[in-house]
């Protein structure tokens, strides 16, 4: 049995003169929760449609369980799709919606009832079998759509932005339910979203896409903490970008980098030559803020002076926008409440307040400047 349940090989898709996928290679592991993440128009839904059989690649191959299924129609692939709109039949009961697929394939009698009720029980809707879709909440309709896909016992379940129509709290709850369901069933899930937080919280691996190309494939932690290029760094979460120049190379993978007059010894996973322009990337939560009266003159000499331009209270955190004095660049920082600061006064920043900024060296990512 192959480790990979579904695979794209050199898949290209063009509509007339417009190419929306450029020679994509993708292997989906058996039993994993894989998310295709990217902005609108990046090609993620096109990949889903190629896997489902709703579209055929212009060039390239689709394999399912090691077999070439490029020419097979959707009903012969062992793959089911949950659509963004759910596509439930409004005139049918929940039971009949879920039973629709097996009935088409000739399943009936006690076997049909057993399979339908098992699917409804799996999504915790076994008590709703005789209701109509209009009598259900958005989250319940979502679960009916999932049950309708699961009742066919697919090798792979494809989900096309299927949480986007839900409100914030329900969407968060369904993220947890979907991941638990996938783990319980052991079925491969391929999920499409443009929501970075959704991708990071649910996935075993994330495929980051842009302009019809795969930019990076990795675990949520890898794509967040070790982005392979500036697009991934900027699209997956927020990030600050400082442009610098390599002024010395050391043999241990560390470099002296000049950031507008501050020469800092930093380590990089990539190789750079003296004189190379680089982007030093720092997440907002990794920046540290020094206020007036904190640190000695010697401490502050190597830090970046700035001014607080905006204070954004978010309940559990306070976000600051700081304008650097030397370059006029804006940095975004996230400050967390301290349990020893019951009044929250330590995060009581003022617009216009002078501050200094630095970070723990080693938490940055250094990439070639683009």
Regions found by a protein language model. Name each.
Residues 58-61, 111, 211, 243:
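Conserved coupling/switch loops of ABC nucleotide-binding domains, chiefly the family-specific signature
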Residues 52:
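Helix-to-loop junction immediately C-terminal to a conserved catalytic motif
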Residues 60-68:
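Conserved ABC transporter NBD signature motif
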Residues 239, 249-370:
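Non-catalytic connector elements of ABC transporters
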Residues 33, 74-234:
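ABC ATPase nucleotide-binding domains
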Residues 37-39:
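The feature captures the beta-strand-to-loop junction immediately N-terminal to the Walker
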């Amino acid at each position: 049995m192959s480790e990979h349940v579904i695979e794209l090989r050199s898949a290209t898709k063009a509509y007339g003169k417009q190419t929306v996928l450029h020679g994509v290679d993708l292997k989906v592991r058996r039993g994993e929760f894989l998310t295709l993440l990217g902005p609108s128009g990046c090609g993620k839904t096109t990949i889903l449609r190629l896997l489902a059989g709703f579209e055929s690649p212009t060039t390239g191959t689709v394999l399912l369980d090691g077999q070439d299924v490029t020419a097979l129609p959707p009903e012969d692939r062992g793959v089911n799709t949950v659509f963004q709109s759910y596509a439930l039949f409004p005139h049918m009961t929940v039971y009949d919606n879920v039973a629709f697929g097996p009935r088409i394939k000739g399943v009936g009698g006690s076997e049909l009832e057993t399979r339908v009720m098992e699917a409804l029980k799996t999504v915790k809707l076994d008590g709703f079998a005789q209701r109509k879709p209009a009598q259900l909440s958005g989250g319940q309709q979502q679960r009916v759509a999932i049950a309708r896909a699961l009742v066919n016992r697919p090798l792979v379940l494809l989900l096309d932005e299927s949480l986007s129509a839900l409100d914030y709290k329900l969407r968060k709850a369904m993220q947890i339910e979907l991941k638990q369901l996938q783990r319980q069933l052991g079925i491969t899930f391929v999920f499409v979203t443009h929501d970075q937080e959704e991708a990071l919280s649910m996935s075993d691996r994330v495929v980051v896409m842009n302009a019809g190309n795969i930019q990076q494939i990795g675990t949520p932690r890898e794509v967040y903490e070790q982005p392979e290029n500036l697009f991934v760094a900027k699209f997956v979460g927020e990030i600050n970008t400082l442009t610098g120049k390599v002024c010395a190379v050391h043999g241990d993978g560390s470099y002296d980098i000049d950031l507008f007059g501050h020469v800092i010894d930093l380590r990089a996973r990539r190789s750079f030559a003296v004189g190379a322009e680089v982007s030093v990337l720092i997440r907002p939560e990794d920046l540290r803020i020094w206020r007036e009266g904190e640190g000695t003159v010697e401490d502050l000499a190597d830090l970046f002076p700035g001014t607080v331009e905006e204070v954004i209270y978010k309940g559990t955190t306070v976000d600051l926008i700081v304008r650097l004095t030397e370059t006029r660049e804006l940095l975004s920082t996230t400050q967390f409440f301290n349990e020893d600061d019951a009044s929250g006064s330590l995060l009581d920043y003022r617009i216009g307040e002078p501050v200094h900024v630095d970070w723990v060296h080693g938490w940055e990512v250094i990439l070639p400047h683009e």
